[in-house]
């Protein structure tokens, strides 16, 4: 049987797409999930201290608000449980093909169908929604000798809780978002922790990360509109912050001054303080939030190593100054394949086009959601739809305001739909024109940029503008073949 829609992934994006498709009267669709459980990022990232840095009321689906959050900024287990609850409430589990890893997605022009090859067999679909997300594939560091390490190795996104860290010498590579949350949790139990830092991060204190009071939960449950009001107040606060990222970069100096005061208060050692001081504009790389990272870094069993890594040997990490730092456990907090996401390499469209090329700056896209050489294929979390200041869930729902009507039209008219190349080029050029005047155009090296230095990741404007631009399916912007 040919599916109307094949959805790749069952995290926030896949679940939201399923609910929106069903609400639009579209049936005969399925989610393909390579794991044995739903949840995506929040299923996979189980490292100690893992939490969201967007408020719980905002980092949730608009049609599935949760009045029972226990913390204003939730930890991983509660977010994963929220996704499980969403699937249960909307009866989505039966739509998920668990343990189905997609190996290839190729368009059959003669049949006007997408052919999906999985480890459990082959499928066909009239439409495809890629909802695997940008944080799906863990990136191990490209360091000589990593495979020769005699101890135990793991990535924060593939945490192995069976590894006992008590009394161990631990090497942590990376000081990004995962590391900043995880390091304070392992320092008290490790005998020694070496933290390898390439670039210092801007870190702000977590001003509002606190347990939700009982009376607040009762208000959310029984006072109509109360939680909705809090959600939107948080949204607009973040949009004001976004102005500094996108239009008023000089205002970031206030945040940089505040971050410096926080760092100076926590780190009294001038040498360590200097090592932890960023040399780029705040926001060019992801801004981190933590009350516990700096206190962890001043503990007597912690060393911050900024000397470059030469190679990894059986007994530890050798830096470029020739010193061998012995370790029992190697933890890689080295992020994900974002601008070169492997899922893009699996998708083959017209004229032998490969979707991954869009992230290399070689292919235009439309609304970060569709591509001219990939008919009836759509992508959540596509080019320039990630954020540096607000909730990605808002962006997913905005994209679906375009994607679902487009799919509904294609099914109703039995049509093949793809954005006109001229419209895709127009959209992509507009994004590129915006970026140089934003904080992401100030010259730092980050995972927001592709190999060519182009911002292919972050939306360089206010999110409410994106919501307006994605409102509905504009037939005049598309090539339509019946």
Task: List each language-model region with its residue ranges.
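Short beta-strand to alpha-helix junction loop
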Residues: 66-85, 246-254, 280-292
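Feature captures the FAD/FMN-dependent oxidoreductase FAD-binding
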Residues: 71-136, 311
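Alpha/beta-hydrolase fold catalytic core
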Residues: 260-326
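Glycine/threonine-rich phosphate-binding loop and adjacent beta-strand/alpha-helix elements that clamp
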Residues: 333-407
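C-terminal active-site-capping segments
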Residues: 394-397, 401-482
């Amino acid at each position: 049987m040919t599916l109307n829609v094949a959805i790749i992934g069952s995290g926030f994006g896949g679940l939201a797409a399923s609910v929106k498709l069903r609400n639009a009267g579209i049936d005969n669709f399925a989610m393909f999930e390579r794991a044995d459980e739903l949840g995506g990022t929040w299923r996979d990232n189980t490292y100690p201290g893992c939490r969201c840095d967007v408020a719980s009321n905002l980092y949730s689906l608009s049609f599935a608000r949760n009045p029972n959050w226990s913390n204003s900024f939730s930890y991983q287990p509660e977010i994963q449980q929220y996704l499980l609850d969403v699937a249960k409430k909307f009866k989505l589990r039966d739509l998920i093909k668990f343990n189905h890893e997609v190996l290839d997605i190729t368009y059959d022009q003669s049949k006007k169908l997408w052919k999906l090859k999985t480890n459990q067999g082959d499928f066909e679909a009239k439409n495809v929604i890629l909802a695997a997300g940008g944080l799906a594939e863990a990136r191990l560091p490209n360091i000589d000798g990593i495979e020769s390490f005699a101890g135990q190795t793991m990535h924060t996104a593939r945490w192995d809780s069976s590894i006992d860290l008590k009394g161990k010498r631990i090497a942590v590579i990376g000081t990004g978002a995962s590391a900043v949350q995880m390091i304070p949790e392992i320092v008290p139990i490790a005998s020694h922790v070496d933290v390898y830092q390439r670039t210092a991060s801007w870190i702000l204190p977590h001003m509002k990360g606190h347990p939700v009071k009982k009376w607040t939960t009762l208000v959310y449950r029984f006072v109509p509109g109360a939680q909705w009001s809090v959600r939107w107040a948080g949204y607009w606060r973040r949009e004001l912050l976004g102005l500094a990222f996108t239009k008023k970069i000089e205002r970031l100096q206030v945040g940089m001054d505040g971050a410096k005061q926080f760092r100076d208060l926590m780190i009294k050692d001038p040498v360590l303080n200097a090592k932890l001081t960023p040399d780029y504009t705040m926001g060019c790389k992801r801004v981190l939030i933590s009350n516990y990272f700096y206190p962890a870094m001043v503990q007597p069993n912690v060393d911050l190593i900024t000397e470059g890594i030469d190679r990894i040997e059986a007994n530890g990490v050798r830096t470029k100054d020739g010193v061998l730092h012995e370790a029992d456990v190697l933890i890689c907090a080295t992020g994900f394949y974002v601008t070169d996401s492997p899922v893009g390499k699996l998708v083959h469209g017209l004229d032998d086009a490969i979707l991954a090329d869009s992230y290399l700056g070689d292919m235009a896209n439309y609304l970060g959601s569709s591509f001219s050489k990939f008919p009836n294929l759509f992508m959540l979390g596509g080019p320039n739809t990630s954020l540096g200041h607000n909730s990605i869930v808002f962006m997913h729902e905005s994209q679906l305001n375009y994607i679902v009507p487009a799919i509904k039209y294609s099914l109703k008219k039995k049509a093949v739909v793809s954005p006109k190349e001229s419209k895709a080029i127009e959209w992509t050029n507009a994004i590129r024109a915006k970026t140089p005047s934003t904080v992401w155009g100030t010259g730092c090296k980050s995972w927001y940029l592709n190999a060519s230095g182009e911002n292919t990741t972050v939306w360089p404007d206010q999110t409410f503008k994106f919501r307006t631009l994605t409102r509905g399916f504009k037939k005049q912007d598309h090539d339509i073949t019946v």
